[in-house]
Regions:
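Extended interaction regions within the primary functional domain
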Residues: 33-34, 50, 107, 122
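General beta-strand structural signal in soluble alpha/beta enzymes
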Residues: 11, 49-53, 99-103
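Solvent-exposed alpha-helices and their adjacent loops that cap or buttress functional pockets
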Residues: 1-5, 40-44, 49-50, 94, ...
Length: 129
């Protein structure tokens, strides 16, 4: 049996990783492939936390070009990250991987509030956060 160098990892995924090559939006094939790879890591006994971007859905420079208030553009990006997290959550759970989506923006019906200790607890229970 191999010895793991890390027992807990944080994976940073750009939003574009959920898009088909050269595209935008969320591609089901890409989401399933990423979920399969994450499942393989979990099966090694590694705790996994994921931070996902939203570049496939929203780019801040578009907001700048529109003359949008920076805070509004930032909020749009944060909403995009939750959308991507929900898509990845669904792909993971279809493969039998328990997950929790957490966010610092309050939206109780779709994601838990991010609390560091709660995130650690979820990972200790075998969930991908």
């Amino acid at each position: 049996m191999q010895t793991l160098k890390y027992h807990r990892i944080m994976l940073k995924l750009g939003g574009e990783s959920l898009s088909a090559a050269g595209g935008s939006g969320i591609d089901a094939v890409q989401a399933k492939d990423i979920a399969r790879r994450i499942k393989e890591v979990r099966e090694l006994g590694v705790d996994v936390a994921i931070v996902i971007g939203a570049g496939n859905l929203w780019r801040g420079r578009v907001g700048q070009e529109m003359g949008m208030d920076q805070a509004t553009a930032d909020y749009m990006g944060m909403l995009g990250t939750v959308m991507n997290a929900l898509a990845l959550m669904d792909a993971l759970e279809h493969q039998g991987v328990m997950t929790r989506v957490m966010t610092s923006i309050e939206m109780k019906t779709v994601a838990e509030p991010y609390i560091w200790r709660r995130a650690i607890h979820h990972m200790e229970k075998g969930r991908v956060v």
